[in-house]
């Protein structure tokens, strides 16, 4: 079932700015959401609370995402990013396992393999994606690269993007190839980097977005968090004056892969809201 929600027209236009900003160089390198995109999330939160029954129907629906894997390596060795079919199959299984409780599944349509040392180290992103990208704006393209400048991955939030535009072409997630199941990134090689980044593709922010004050990640059932977690610090409470302890098991924190367990019900609703608004 597909349920589409209409935001104020001006807000839809604001989303075109959502891909602005700088990527970091530690952990997740997804752009910080712009003020305009944060405003869209706040409005969605208001609509979700006001129309709980309608949004509940959306969250009870199912989404099947056409998915394309692009392996971009500097040579035909795993060490240089040429990950195996088994590693990719295991990665897809992790994605489907993590999102299945929320009615979301990923159907792998095609896998491409490219040897290009420049692209394999995240050089000339737009040219690479212009050459490799498949499907429409509702299709998920994952680019597995050998080196992303010290980061594990980055992705792009849903936005208003016309076919052929830079925002449309850049859409998708770039993933460090050594983070897939069986990869060499210690503590981060169970495939949960993809789960985290795809959460961004569905419009979710980090659980520590905004720190201890304000609207945070604009999700009512994720406790406030002042900063990213490291490892799996059970009981960590970085916002002691706010309800709850840090959501260290949430896929949108920075915990190690074995610590990750969940998206919340309100995160599920938000994923459906953004998908139906921009990608359906």
Swiss-Prot record:
<dbReference type="GO" id="GO:0006508">
    <property type="term" value="P:proteolysis"/>
</dbReference>
<keyword id="KW-0378">Hydrolase</keyword>
<feature type="disulfide bond">
    <location>
        <begin position="232"/>
        <end position="259"/>
    </location>
</feature>
<feature type="glycosylation site" description="N-linked (GlcNAc...) asparagine">
    <location>
        <position position="51"/>
    </location>
</feature>
<dbReference type="GO" id="GO:0005576">
    <property type="term" value="C:extracellular region"/>
</dbReference>
<comment type="similarity">
    <text>Belongs to the peptidase M43B family.</text>
</comment>
<dbReference type="InterPro" id="IPR008754">
    <property type="entry name" value="Peptidase_M43"/>
</dbReference>
<feature type="binding site">
    <location>
        <position position="196"/>
    </location>
    <ligand>
        <name>Zn(2+)</name>
    </ligand>
</feature>
<keyword id="KW-0732">Signal</keyword>
<feature type="region of interest" description="Disordered">
    <location>
        <begin position="217"/>
        <end position="236"/>
    </location>
</feature>
<keyword id="KW-0645">Protease</keyword>
<keyword id="KW-0964">Secreted</keyword>
<dbReference type="GO" id="GO:0046872">
    <property type="term" value="F:metal ion binding"/>
</dbReference>
<keyword id="KW-0482">Metalloprotease</keyword>
<protein>
    <recommendedName>
        <fullName>Extracellular metalloprotease GLRG_06286</fullName>
        <ecNumber>3.4.24.-</ecNumber>
    </recommendedName>
</protein>
<dbReference type="InterPro" id="IPR024079">
    <property type="entry name" value="MetalloPept_cat_dom_sf"/>
</dbReference>
<dbReference type="Pfam" id="PF05572">
    <property type="entry name" value="Peptidase_M43"/>
</dbReference>
<keyword id="KW-0325">Glycoprotein</keyword>
<keyword id="KW-0479">Metal-binding</keyword>
<feature type="signal peptide">
    <location>
        <begin position="1"/>
        <end position="17"/>
    </location>
</feature>
<feature type="active site">
    <location>
        <position position="197"/>
    </location>
</feature>
<comment type="function">
    <text>Secreted metalloproteinase that allows assimilation of proteinaceous substrates.</text>
</comment>
<keyword id="KW-0862">Zinc</keyword>
<dbReference type="GO" id="GO:0008237">
    <property type="term" value="F:metallopeptidase activity"/>
</dbReference>
<keyword id="KW-1015">Disulfide bond</keyword>
<feature type="binding site">
    <location>
        <position position="200"/>
    </location>
    <ligand>
        <name>Zn(2+)</name>
    </ligand>
</feature>
């Amino acid at each position: 079932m597909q349920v589409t929600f209409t935001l104020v027209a001006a807000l839809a236009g604001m989303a075109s700015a959502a891909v602005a900003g700088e990527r970091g160089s530690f952990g997740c390198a997804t752009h910080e959401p712009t003020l305009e995109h944060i405003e869209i999330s706040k409005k969605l939160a208001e609509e979700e609370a006001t129309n709980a029954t309608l949004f509940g129907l959306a969250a009870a629906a199912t989404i099947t995402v056409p998915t394309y894997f692009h392996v971009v390596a500097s040579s035909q060795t795993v060490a240089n990013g040429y990950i195996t079919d088994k590693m990719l199959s295991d990665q897809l299984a992790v994605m489907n396992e993590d999102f299945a409780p929320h009615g979301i599944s990923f159907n792998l349509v095609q896998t491409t393999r490219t040897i290009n040392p420049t692209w394999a180290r995240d050089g000339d992103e737009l040219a690479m994606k212009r050459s490799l990208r498949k499907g429409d704006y509702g299709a998920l393209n994952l680019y597995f690269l050998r080196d992303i400048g010290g980061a594990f991955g980055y992705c792009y939030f849903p936005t208003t993007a016309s076919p052929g535009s830079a925002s449309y072409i850049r859409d998708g997630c770039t993933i460090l190839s050594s983070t897939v199941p069986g990869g060499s990134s210690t503590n981060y090689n169970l495939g949960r980097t993809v789960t985290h980044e795809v959460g961004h593709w569905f419009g979710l922010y980090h659980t520590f977005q905004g720190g201890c004050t304000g609207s945070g990640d604009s999700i009512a059932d994720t406790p406030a968090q002042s900063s990213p977690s490291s490892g799996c610090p059970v009981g960590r409470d970085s916002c002691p004056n706010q309800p709850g302890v840090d959501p260290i098991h949430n896929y949108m924190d920075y915990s190690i892969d074995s610590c990750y367990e969940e998206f919340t019900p309100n995160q599920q609703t938000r994923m459906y809201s953004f998908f139906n608004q921009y990608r359906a």
